[in-house]
């Protein structure tokens, strides 16, 4: 049945859903890679599609920007539509220049400046981590495709603008490699409701140097990330 934010019918989603932030990237993935892709939800222009990839039924749906938006969509997919596996595919900014532009990054753990996980966890710190089986599947799939990935930790920031002074130094010292805006929420939602989640990201910015990809490139390219995510998804 429909939820406040998803108007799909029961059974409309596959057990595994790839989730970019951008609805247009979801549309691109569905139209480029999925056979028989059907638009199953479009509330607020947040598109969700279901089709098949190499014979396996898969879905792709956008989650928007930030932990609150991503948490809404992942919660409803898991609780109301029976989704078992979430693979976030998105972009991130590298904290240090040793991680290169367009490199693939798999998020093992997610720190955050958001309070949402403390609210879930009786005001204590929660270790938001990827499901190991999904993480290993993504890493192995990348290796099979001959694609280099870095596995490490992300910082899920509430603010896109306004990073605290010296924050990059703190993150680097504590081995937090990249910044994004959703995974600390997605990982905790998946754990709370008994699902599994992992994030595979493409480095779109090198924060200390100012190197960056264009908005168009972030929407329409990053094909390596998509191929790894799709080929990992059909193994689940």
Swiss-Prot record:
One of its GO terms (molecular function) is purine-nucleoside phosphorylase activity. Keywords: Glycosyltransferase, Transferase. Its EC number is 2.4.2.1. Gene3D superfamilies: Nucleoside phosphorylase domain. The keyword Transferase applies. It catalyses: a purine D-ribonucleoside + phosphate = a purine nucleobase + alpha-D-ribose 1-phosphate; a purine 2'-deoxy-D-ribonucleoside + phosphate = a purine nucleobase + 2-deoxy-alpha-D-ribose 1-phosphate. Transmembrane segments: none annotated. A purine D-ribonucleoside binds at residues 5, 180-182, 204-205. InterPro entries: DeoD-type (IPR004402), Nucleoside_phosphorylase_d (IPR000845), Nucleoside_phosphorylase_sf (IPR035994). One of its GO terms (biological process) is purine nucleoside catabolic process. The record marks 218 as: Important for catalytic activity. Phosphate binds at residues 21, 25, 44, 88-91. GO terms for cellular component: cytosol. It holds the Pfam family PNP_UDP_1. The active site is at 205 (proton donor). NCBIfam families: deoD, PRK05819.1, PRK13374.1. HAMAP family: Pur_nucleosid_phosp. Homohexamer; trimer of homodimers. Catalyzes the reversible phosphorolytic breakdown of the N-glycosidic bond in the beta-(deoxy)ribonucleoside molecules, with the formation of the corresponding free purine bases and pentose-1-phosphate. Belongs to the PNP/UDP phosphorylase family. This is Purine nucleoside phosphorylase DeoD-type. The lineage of its organism: Bacteria, Pseudomonadati, Pseudomonadota, Betaproteobacteria, Neisseriales.
